[in-house]
Amino acid sequence: MAISKESKAQYFEKLRSLFEKYNSLFVVNIDNVSSQQMHTVRKQLRGTAELIMGKNTMIRRAMRGIINDMPELERLLPVVRGNVGFVFTNADLKEVRETIIANVIAAPARPNAIAPLDVFVPAGNTGMEPGKTSFFQALGIPTKITRGTIEITSDVHLVSKDAKVGPSEATLLNMLNISPFTYGMDVLTIYDQGNVFSPEILDVSEEDLIGHLLSAASIITAISLGANYPTILSVMHSVVNAYKNLVAVSLATEYTFEGTEQTKAFLADPSAFVVAAAPAAAAGGEAEAPAAEAAAEEEEESDEDMGFGLFD
């Protein structure tokens, strides 16, 4: 059914108003998403975000009409492909993403559908009558008859990820009441204030960023020191290393400066160190004696108090 010019104009105006109102949006894949799921997501996002759908050609045409005023939107054009929609928001991106991807439902396998994951049939009794054994044999599934029913003897990898589901595989899964797939909105790309990035970026925590920053700082410092090229990160280490070298040279030669005078004196006359350390040790002993006397006095006072009764 053809869309009228009036409807297109209204859609273009609606999209423009959303781009002007919101700073961020999610590009979401809506393959196999039911209308009921769409309604539920819209309801959960109400007051926080707005979901808009449309044909890709209409979305691109509307965006090209806005690019003159908002040139940063040109970065979004390449990601408008496939069965996608936009979720506009100014709220916390992580919270909105969780709401978008939380609404999923289990779905049966359909013939010719692309499997989003590997599908396994578990070992166990199927409850089916022996007459259907040939059906399992055709799919290469090992079985045996147990108490008049078919039993699968080992787990079977029935469908590989990204492969088409065959009619026989779909029939078997339905016969076993296995709904192997879950369908819901999938976030493909995030647009935020002119920047386009992968949704995995939202999973990077503040601790991860700090860890990467510290690791980078350590690497830069090591390279700077190794290349003897001073940087803000390495200059303190360079100064300390240079001072250590200067002290080593001073101790090995007759050159003396303020930082090595005392060390050289102690090395020349170790007994001077013993003499210098003695007053400090004596001062420590004198400080301990008054403390011991004070403790003894407190103990005596406590003992005297113990001799009085409540009404003495």
Curated annotation (Swiss-Prot):
Signal peptide: none annotated. Belongs to the universal ribosomal protein uL10 family. Residues 286-312 are annotated as: Disordered. Pfam families: Ribosomal_60s, Ribosomal_L10, RL10P_insert. Component of the ribosome, a large ribonucleoprotein complex responsible for the synthesis of proteins in the cell. The small ribosomal subunit (SSU) binds messenger RNAs (mRNAs) and translates the encoded message by selecting cognate aminoacyl-transfer RNA (tRNA) molecules. The large subunit (LSU) contains the ribosomal catalytic site termed the peptidyl transferase center (PTC), which catalyzes the formation of peptide bonds, thereby polymerizing the amino acids delivered by tRNAs into a polypeptide chain. InterPro entries: Ribosomal_protein_uL10, Ribosomal_uL10, Ribosomal_uL10-like_insert, Ribosomal_uL10-like_insert_sf, Ribosomal_uL10-like_sf, uL10_eukaryotes. Keywords: Cytoplasm, Phosphoprotein, Ribonucleoprotein, Ribosomal protein. Phosphorylated. This is Large ribosomal subunit protein uL10. The modification Phosphoserine is found at S302. Its main location: cytoplasm. It comes from Schizosaccharomyces pombe (strain 972 / ATCC 24843) (Fission yeast). It is found in: Cytoplasm. GO terms for molecular function: large ribosomal subunit rRNA binding; structural constituent of ribosome. Component of the large ribosomal subunit (LSU). Mature yeast ribosomes consist of a small (40S) and a large (60S) subunit. The 40S small subunit contains 1 molecule of ribosomal RNA (18S rRNA) and at least 33 different proteins. The large 60S subunit contains 3 rRNA molecules (25S, 5.8S and 5S rRNA) and at least 46 different proteins. The acidic ribosomal P-proteins form the stalk structure of the 60S subunit. They are organized as a pentameric complex in which uL10/P0 interacts with 2 heterodimers of P1 and P2 proteins. uL10 directly interacts with 28S rRNA. One of its GO terms (biological process) is cytoplasmic translation. SUPFAM superfamilies: Ribosomal protein L10-like. Residues 295-306 have a biased composition (Acidic residues). The gene is rpp0. The keyword Transit peptide does not apply. GO terms for cellular component: 90S preribosome; cytosol; cytosolic large ribosomal subunit.
